Amino acid sequence: MEAVVNKFLKYISFDTKSNEDSNAHPSTEGQMVLAKELARELKEMGMIDVSVDSKAYVMATLPANTENHVPTIGFIAHMDTAPDMSGKDVKPQFVENYDGKDIILNKEKNIVLKVKDFPEIKDYIGKTLITTDGTTLLGADDKAGVAEIMTAMEHLINHPEIKHGTVKIAFTPDEEIGAGADYFDVEKFNADFAYTVDGGTVGELEYENFNAAGVKLTIHGRNVHPGSAKDKMINSITVGNELHSMLPENEVPEHTEGYEGFYHIVAFNGTVEETKMQYIIRDFDRKKFEERKATMQKVVDTLNSKYGEGTVELQMNDQYYNMKEKVEPVHHIVDTAFKAIEEVGLVPKVVPIRGGTDGARLSFMGLPTPNLFTGGHNFHGKFEFIPTFAMSKAVDVILKIIELYSK
């Protein structure tokens, strides 16, 4: 346990917050700094073919030490932390032998991790938790994944008696801004399949994610002096409100769960003359996903018929798809991970990802990639925490998957 925790504490000291407004790759310099450090550590521990490219993708190989015909397995995690909150000067706090009560993160600022807000924390009574000090996020998403993969590789190198096939590892930049797979060289990586280590609760295994589209709307109004505006003015803000009201009221993130999809308005800025709106559309079912996009198009067409052609301009683009259709043909990769989770003494929880991962994109690039847990909770904010035992269990699962395939 100590090794994975120490690595995690080291990696969260690097500020690697990604920036969605940047056109650079990686989007922030801190990611390249961490990439170079990881490459240095990989070389030092004895991995081969260690590389960091100009976009900060780190790749390395652990060569096989068995004559058996064993598939080449990849493990992938991302180095960046979410833009939602600062990841600079993270001050982790240890809560040992957690007693099931509220945790004071920052007395001075009265920031408290409350059981009533996050009841799942009671699952960890008696365990050691790592929390924030309430002023930053923690960075378990996904530096816990990085630390877990690094620890597993170090263990295999230090224990050559454990037989294994070729293992490939990669650490990616900019996952949090949706660009983690943009420059991922699948051919160079050269694995038969892979796993991202980027999930949440201990025991989780994910191989289904949303189909996703992004929507940008520009509404053109007609501004006329309000004193003489009757039958002349078109207020673009009002049209925007009308557009929003034409979408299903309850099919939004705050009223959906499990396999339910949604429309989510993420930006709405306007004047009488011009309003800009942004939505994301999400659904697990491809048919329902296409129907949601058609609904958005129909709403726009209706408003253009009412207010005049070109009043509402629509840009809609698909962002990623449900990896399930690419993972199903090689379902053994899910079955093996499920078995590995069981064999290390956990109860596997197969859950749909209400979001996307690098693995979703990679699966459509020819590298089927389900997602394994890191053990963390409440990612992207000051209430993020991770139980230390969950991190060592994640290491155990990585090692167990490799072991099961080497038999």
UniProtKB/Swiss-Prot annotation:
The catalytic residues are: D80, E175
Q: EC number(s) per UniProt?
A: 3.4.11.4
Q: Which UniProt keywords apply?
A: Aminopeptidase, Cytoplasm, Hydrolase, Metal-binding, Metalloprotease, Protease, Zinc
Q: Which residues bind Zn(2+) 2?
A: D141, E176, H380
Q: Does the keyword Cytoplasm apply?
A: yes
Give one GO molecular function term. Answer: metallopeptidase activity
Record-annotated residues binding Zn(2+) 1? H78, D141, D198
Q: Tell me, what's a Pfam family for it?
A: Peptidase_M20
Which GO annotations describe the biological process of this protein? peptide catabolic process; proteolysis
Q: Where is it mainly found?
A: cytoplasm
Query: Per the record's keyword annotation, is Metal-binding included, yes or no?
Result: yes
Single GO cellular component term: cytosol
Kindly give the NCBIfam families that the UniProt entry links to this protein.
Answer: peptidase-T, PRK05469.1, PRK13381.1
Q: Which family does it belong to?
A: Belongs to the peptidase M20B family.
Q: What does this protein do?
A: Cleaves the N-terminal amino acid of tripeptides.
Protein name per UniProt: Peptidase T
This protein's species is Clostridium novyi (strain NT)
